[in-house]
Curated annotation (Swiss-Prot):
Localisation per UniProt entry: Periplasm
Gene: tolB
Keywords annotated in UniProt: Cell cycle, Cell division, Periplasm, Signal
Subunit structure: The Tol-Pal system is composed of five core proteins: the inner membrane proteins TolA, TolQ and TolR, the periplasmic protein TolB and the outer membrane protein Pal. They form a network linking the inner and outer membranes and the peptidoglycan layer.
Gene3D superfamilies found in the cross-reference section: TolB, C-terminal domain, TolB, N-terminal domain
Organism domain of life: Bacteria
The protein's name: Tol-Pal system protein TolB
Length: 443
């Protein structure tokens, strides 16, 4: 049986790092599917899914399939079935599969596809997602891209599958900026780097001659703000990723640390260290370079992070003794403490969904990554150990990335964990790595 094109819709995707991708929606089933994943019910049994090698004239089809499978498996929501168990060999991805062959191996969803080279040198990637027990096609799309951009196509396909089966946006077509750490501990070289969310395509964006820390993406993904010790004193800089151009964010007399963009990208919030040892939170409007002081305490106020709607800011302050989490209006009004547990809290970051705040907690000799509701209730620790720090949210608010350093020799490594705390994965990087920051979805 052939599945014809029911509806065609072209969309164009641009990226600062990739060529144009055009996508066409070719077929969808009714809105209610037999197979779906309810990601709001707590602990979830991963969905068995069969992902066949995409037909191609070379190894590229298999490579794309491997990236898709790895993305979905790493989310903890999917269990890709071993290809050795497949009964049917897909020879025509345009035709409906033999659903009974896939039901026998309990493949509740099936992905088929094809990669072909076009006369202009571009690649055409097609895929279809099937509900095997419902006997229907759920989604079908095709993409055009340059050969060197094949990994991004794989991530986009994985996002489409994730969204169709969970109802939530995926997070695979994203990047992470982080601090790459190389060399011996006494002479550690720290460079800013960018990679795909799965650790591939690492690119360095600083040379390591000056210590650089706390990189953070702008909402449009075109800029990074970070702290550099160039000249011996920490200052906040703004780096244009496409051109490499950078500029100082505010020529303050003291040290500036912990920068982060506002949700609209028009401001940077940061902390300014005072001569008396205190630190207060300031914003700089990037349009006119005006600064506004938000806190005026004798304490250390730092680690500010906006709510997704830009109306509130969460930050760390030791004004009550130990470092705790506080929330205030974006104009500095009505500061109130929200963390009430034992220990010290730091590195708060607001979820893109607006419902949770992630943080680092130090208590009883351990560092934990946790989340709480925005009023401080419902605190949950997701992972604990010798040193876990610096959570950053995936753009769908379902997964966190952080860095961990084990006791003894060695250095920090990057990990992801979901909100159940059960699905923890290491992200492979060329060297030691710390202080990650997740980008929004690419476009």
């Amino acid at each position: 049986m052939k599945i014809g094109i029911i509806n065609t819709k072209i969309r164009t995707v641009f990226s600062a790092f990739a060529c144009m991708i055009a996508a066409s929606l070719v077929c969808t089933m009714p809105a209610r599917a037999v197979v779906e994943i309810n990601i709001n019910k707590g602990v979830i049994e991963p969905l068995p899914i069969a992902i066949t090698d995409f037909l191609s004239a070379d190894q590229l089809g298999s490579n794309i399939t491997s990236v898709i499978a790895a993305d979905l498996e790493r989310s903890g929501l999917f269990a890709p079935i071993d290809k050795g168990a497949f009964i049917e060999k897909i020879s025509n991805p345009d035709a409906a599969p033999r659903f009974e062959d896939w039901k026998v191996i309990n493949a509740q969803a099936l992905v088929t596809g094809r990669i072909t080279k076009q006369p202009d040198g571009r690649l055409k990637a097609e895929f279809r997602l099937w509900d095997t027990f419902g006997g229907q096609q759920m989604i079908g799309q095709q993409f055009f891209t340059t050969p060197d951009n094949w990994r991004r196509v794989a991530h986009i396909i994985a996002d489409a599958i994730y969204e169709r089966l969970t109802g939530d946006k995926g997070y695979f077509d994203t990047r992470v900026v982080f601090v790459d750490e190389s060399g011996p501990a006494q002479k550690r070289v720290k460079r800013l780097a960018i990679m795909d969310q799965d650790g591939a395509n690492v690119r360095f964006i600083s040379d390591g001659r000056a210590l650089s820390l706390t990189p953070r993406f702008s909402p449009n993904r075109q800029e990074v703000t970070y702290m550099s010790f160039e000249g011996g004193s920490p200052k906040v800089y703004l780096l244009q990723l496409e051109t490499g151009q950078r500029e100082l964010v505010g020529n303050f007399p003291g040290m500036t640390i912990a920068p982060r963009f506002s949700p609209d990208g028009q401001k940077v919030v940061m902390s300014l260290l005072q001569d008396d040892g205190s630190a207060n939170i300031y914003t700089m409007d990037l349009r006119n370079r005006t600064t506004t002081r938000l806190t005026s305490s004798q304490a250390i106020d730092t680690g500010a992070s906006y709510s997704p709607d830009g109306s509130q800011i969460v930050f760390t302050s030791d004004r009550g003794g130990r470092p705790q989490l506080y929330v205030m209006g974006a104009d500095g009004s009505n500061p109130r403490r929200i963390s009430m547990g034992d220990g010290s809290y730091s590195t708060p970051v607001w979820s893109p969904r607006g419902d949770l705040i992630a943080f680092t907690k130090q208590s009883q000799g351990q560092f934990s990554i946790g989340v709480m509701k925005t009023d401080g209730s419902g605190e949950r620790l997701l992972t604990s150990g010798f040193h876990n720090e610096g959570p950053t949210w995936a753009p769908n608010g379902r997964v966190l990335m952080f860095f961990r350093k084990a006791a003894g020799a060695g250095g920090p490594k990057l990990f992801t964990i979901d909100l159940t705390g059960r699905n923890e994965r290491q992200i492979q990087t060329p060297n030691f790595a710390s202080d990650p920051a997740w980008s929004p979805l690419l476009e």
